[in-house]
Amino acid sequence: MFSAPGSSLTRWLSVSVRGLRGLSLFSSSESSSNWSKVVSDAEKIVGYPTSFMSLRCLLSDELSNVAMHVRKLVGTQHPLLNTARGFVYDSKNNLQMRGLIVLLLSKAAGPSHAASELLTKDMVSGIYPSQRNLAEITELIHTAFLVHRGIVNLKDWTVSDGPLKDMQFGNKMAVLSGDFLLANACTGLAELNDTKVVELISSAIADLVQGIYYENYYNVEDGLGDGTVLTPWEDQAFLSHGALLAKSCQAAMQLAKHDREAQRLAYLYGKHLSLGHKLNSDLQPFVKSRLGEVTSFSLSAAPVVFHRQIVGKEKWHQQLEEVKHGQSVTLSALLAAVKSEKGVSSAVDLCRYHSNRALEAIQAFPSSEARSALENIASAVNRF
């Protein structure tokens, strides 16, 4: 059903890449009570739950008409249904975290010295209206790409995936609804009347497109290709998972007319927080699975990528072939093989590094509840 070359094994292992990759940031399965408390406390600081930040657009007449057609997909296996269901589980899965981070940073930074007194009077709960609009725009862009990621590659369609016409119809709805959300985001972006912010968010959209291209390009059998075409894992992860948040954080500082240093620190916080949480999400199958338990994991997950680099391409190919042909190595043994090498520990170390870098970046902001919430969020991605 999803675009994964090769055997049924590689399709099974890569389903999280094709079907759930858009949910990987701030929606991993580790949604513990600790993480939920961190998010809940942070939402109280910004004034309202960000789980419904894009609800205004989602409930518009135009998208309501699209939703009526999407209902026809009920009973099919098209991934757009799972995406739609995700909208009502936002408060549980923390899907709308980007907007929350933008609002927290805006509140933590406060008004700049360059801001006029008239502009300062427009602040609500320490946040400018334009910054709240930016947070909504950020969520709309993320949601649009999340919907687009659910488009099925019909070249890999099989009878077991259900009727072909259902997949074709679902793809049309995914393209239409994703484009609608993106168009609304771009309209809102223009209404901010700040060319630098438009440039920043536009470049983030370009980064997302490039990152998704890399994700689609990589060869499942080879892990991440031969290393000459694709960027290193960190660069690729930043494009598809971190650029939007990092540049939105920087744009929030620009809207409040903060200096370049404040913008740089906000960018760094968003960047390192994104990468830290991506690593945390990738690590979940390897730190939570019990001995002998078969857990679905992605071949593009950081521990697997690092494992492949450690053991070498030839041995990695051999391990995949043994699983594919049902030889001595089973799926659970492949998971154990990855866990036995230093790939997992390397990913854990890198996760801690990015968590610490995010904490360092936020220290320059004035001490406040908002800054404490940002510190708690950065620390939470370092817990497994």
Regions found by a protein language model. Name each.
Residues 2-167, 215-228, 355, 377-384:
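Conserved N-terminal diphosphate/IPP-binding helix and adjacent helical/loop segment
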Residues 25-35, 104-120, 146-168, 186, ...:
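Acidic, Mg2+-coordinating active-site segments of isoprenoid diphosphate-utilizing enzymes
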Residues 34-41, 88-95, 169-174, 237, ...:
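Solvent-exposed loop and edge beta-strand segments that line ligand/cofactor-binding
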Residues 59, 63, 131-134, 198-201, ...:
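Hydrophobic packing residues in well-ordered alpha-helices of helical domains and bundles
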Residues 93, 173, 177, 193, ...:
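Short, contiguous, pocket-lining structural segments
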Residues 186-203, 313, 320-321:
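Transmembrane helix-loop-helix
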Residues 333-384:
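C-terminal charged capping/lid subdomain of soluble metabolic enzymes
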